[in-house]
Amino acid sequence: MRIIAGTCKGRRINAPKSIKARPTTDFAKEGLFNVLNNITTINKMKVLDLFAGTGNISYEFSSRGAEKVLAVDQQMSSFRFISEKAKELNLSIKCIKKDVFSFITKANDDVPITLIVFKLVVNILALICRRHKGFLLFKLIKF
């Protein structure tokens, strides 16, 4: 996998075989970021990457200037890999080792997250949310 744009543009990252996840393809990632760049600015965005796996999406957001990136995955191998790579690449990514559904139910509603990214099997589901009169409004984008 590689980082497509931003401060780490062109950097290749090889995930260990111990991570039982497939990284999002460059094609799918380019599609996601093309859509996002047309509807919002990534700079200063706060991102929650659920089922982070290899951290591929987290690295891309952080490289492109997202203010805060929080990666959540229950696998220790994913947690270690993302934490190590983020430090090596000097990217601002906080990694949490926890079951995603447990994390969601215990997460504080006031956490200022601009974008939530779900990756399930091959599909990428991006939930773009914004606060409106105290509620989170979601727009679903499926690639």
PLM-predicted stretches and their roles:
Residues 1-143:
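Class I S-adenosyl-L-methionine-dependent methyltransferase catalytic core
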